[in-house]
């Protein structure tokens, strides 16, 4: 029986990273790939579902659909409820995203949200992102393809390494052709603290009306005290592959007793 993999992303069905992922997966033996991806780019859409308008599947190719006009979470939700009626896929992969998804950026990420939706439905899931070298805006996904194939083979021949409602968040370092990254190794990391700064830009149209563009602040992270290991950001800075276990439970357990005392 073939190993079934559901694929989605947040860059849209025409994205180079998605095509690179599908190509890599189809090179594996006994694997069946189904793609359901947004009809347009949904970067930073978070874990949103579309509840205010209808959605429809549009066939692009064999086992390849775009969802007009849905989010990654919509894609996974509807794929699991309409395509995989009799049995769930063995694995879900969201990506390959163009750009990193590290630290608190995970909460914005449509790529991570695709994996979140998967584990909500008890489907083992991976989110994979390619950290970009902006001197090469098109990106090179060769290393990401190699990594995802290694992970899928390991999972397919063994088991998924995480419990329910946890997914793997994978970030791939840039500069594939550099000496530093040829020997990139997989490193288990924690999610770093992202440093954010206001990067909104005001403009005026020909009628003098104001409008805004939200910019992307450069990757910058704050140190975390009392945490053993290294962060996703530190692994990438060292030219390594970051693999972070992410859980959906956002409860702040360390603060519960303090909160009880405060309430009493």
Curated annotation (Swiss-Prot):
Keyword Methyltransferase: no
Organism: Sulfurimonas denitrificans (strain ATCC 33889 / DSM 1251)
MF (Gene Ontology): 3'-nucleotidase activity; 5'-nucleotidase activity; exopolyphosphatase activity; metal ion binding; nucleotide binding
Name recorded for this polypeptide: 5'-nucleotidase SurE
Domain of life: Bacteria
InterPro entries named in the record: SurE (IPR030048), SurE-like_Pase/nucleotidase (IPR002828), SurE-like_sf (IPR036523)
Recorded family membership: Belongs to the SurE nucleotidase family.
Higher taxonomy: Bacteria, Pseudomonadati, Campylobacterota, Epsilonproteobacteria, Campylobacterales
Family matches, as Gene3D superfamilies: Survival protein SurE-like phosphatase/nucleotidase
